[in-house]
């Protein structure tokens, strides 16, 4: 430890930061990391304990799939560990190109552009498309990256109440902006519900706006073939700008934007988070390719996940705590206070089950919750074990 290091000497800035951290601790908002040993999966090892995990967004159980591991290993042998340059210099390798083409075919969309992360993709898309003369209309429960991107773009930001189509239409009707962009999570990451995408698209068509969808939690899971929210609703429109990630259902890392080729070409030329960063390692792209292939062909995983979701909701008998309305793999249980949510999470941990307590500012004040993430790698027995413990804790 380096507590005596000169960098640890007190300064006004460090004193102020320490005071803010103390306030967070007092309010039950201080976050901590846990070190996971071994692979991500249904069972994980933390501090020597084997825990049943309902934490990860590995919705199809592909993060530790042998096909992804083999693809990553084989690619690393021929490409090395890192790319050493941005995509537009010399970092765009054959694995990246192959993945973009595979995603074009899989999604049935002509243009695809890879990004390092979903956060970077959202920053890149919104700041490239919107500026001071434009307006962004954002759901109040959107992911932080969408909010940050809107602020960074310097466009006029109008936020509407969650899934409030009437409020959104009023804002669109009043706007005189040069370009109007409606932005929404396709699946809301902390509530698990879906955006009313067909109705959003209808409003965009009526008011000459465009619709950007962050389908991080729908890609690979929704739709008969896992093509996400667009397949789920049967939508195809040049007004839709589609973003999805490769680090959740696909089991690897990264993200992509899909839509018209003019859109992706424009983003390649202008999106600063794409231009000014080192390309992600080619082995990661190879693993993502293997994940996309499994999404396309292994329908049994999605079917099993849907059965687990139905089983969980049918068997949940919570009364004091609120199971939110969600038909996705994200099943939030609202506890209310920060302190009680953290305490319930700790009690679950004592019973060998890992479920995160989600608190403000990630969720609205007074709605601290357990965010239960189901995976196709879980069994019905795993789900029943979780529910049995939750029911006992609520009654205690």
From Swiss-Prot:
Cofactor(s) the record lists: pyridoxal 5'-phosphate
GO BP, one annotated term: biotin biosynthetic process
Positions bound to pyridoxal 5'-phosphate: 118-119, 189, 217, 245
Pfam families assigned to the protein according to its UniProt record, in alphabetical order: Aminotran_1_2 (PF00155)
Catalytic activity from the UniProt record: 6-carboxyhexanoyl-[ACP] + L-alanine + H(+) = (8S)-8-amino-7-oxononanoate + holo-[ACP] + CO2
PANTHER family on file: 8-AMINO-7-OXONONANOATE SYNTHASE, CLASS II AMINOTRANSFERASE/8-AMINO-7-OXONONANOATE SYNTHASE
Role noted for this protein: Catalyzes the decarboxylative condensation of pimeloyl-[acyl-carrier protein] and L-alanine to produce 8-amino-7-oxononanoate (AON), [acyl-carrier protein], and carbon dioxide.
Similarity field: Belongs to the class-II pyridoxal-phosphate-dependent aminotransferase family. BioF subfamily.
Protein name: 8-amino-7-oxononanoate synthase
Source organism per UniProt: Methylobacillus flagellatus (strain ATCC 51484 / DSM 6875 / VKM B-1610 / KT)
UniProt lineage: Bacteria, Pseudomonadati, Pseudomonadota, Betaproteobacteria, Nitrosomonadales
């Amino acid at each position: 430890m380096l507590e005596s290091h000169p960098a640890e000497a007190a300064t006004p800035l460090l004193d102020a930061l320490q005071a803010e951290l103390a306030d967070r601790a007092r309010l039950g908002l201080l976050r901590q990391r846990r070190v996971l040993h071994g692979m991500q999966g249904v069972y994980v090892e933390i501090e020597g304990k084997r825990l049943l995990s309902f934490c990860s967004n590995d919705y199809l159980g592909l993060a530790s799939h042998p096909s992804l591991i083999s693809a990553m290993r084989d690619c690393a042998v021929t490409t090395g560990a890192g790319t050493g340059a941005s995509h537009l210099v010399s970092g765009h390798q054959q694995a990246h190109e192959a993945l973009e083409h595979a995603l074009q075919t899989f999604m049935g969309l002509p243009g695809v552009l890879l990004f390092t992360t979903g956060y970077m993709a959202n920053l890149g898309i919104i700041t490239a498309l919107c500026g001071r003369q434009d307006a962004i209309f954002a759901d109040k429960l959107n992911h932080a990256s969408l909010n940050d991107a809107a602020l960074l773009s310097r466009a006029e930001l109008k936020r509407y109440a969650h899934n409030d189509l009437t409020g959104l239409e009023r804002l669109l009707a009043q706007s005189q902006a040069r370009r109007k962009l409606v932005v929404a999570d396709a699946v809301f990451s902390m509530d698990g519900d879906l955006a009313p995408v067909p109705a959003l698209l209808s409003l965009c068509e009526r008011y000459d706006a465009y619709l950007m969808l962050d389908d991080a939690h729908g890609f690979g899971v929704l739709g008969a073939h896992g093509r996400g929210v667009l397949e789920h609703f049967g939508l195809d429109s040049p007004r839709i700008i589609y973003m999805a990630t490769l680090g959740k259902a696909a089991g690897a890392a990264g993200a992509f934007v899909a839509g018209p080729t003019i859109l992706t070409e424009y983003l390649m030329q202008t999106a600063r988070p794409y231009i000014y960063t080192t390309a992600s390692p080619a082995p990661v792209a190879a693993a993502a390719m293997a994940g996309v292939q499994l999404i396309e062909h292994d329908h049994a995983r999605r079917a099993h996940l849907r059965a687990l979701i139905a089983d969980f909701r049918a068997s949940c008998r919570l009364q004091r705590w609120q199971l939110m309305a969600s038909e996705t793999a994200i099943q939030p249980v609202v506890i209310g206070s920060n302190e009680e949510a953290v305490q319930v999470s700790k009690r679950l941990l004592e019973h060998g089950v890992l479920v995160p307590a989600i608190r403000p500012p990630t969720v609205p004040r007074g709605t601290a919750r357990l965010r239960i993430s189901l995976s196709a790698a879980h069994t019905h027995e795993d789900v029943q074990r979780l529910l049995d413990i939750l029911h006992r804790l609520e009654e205690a």
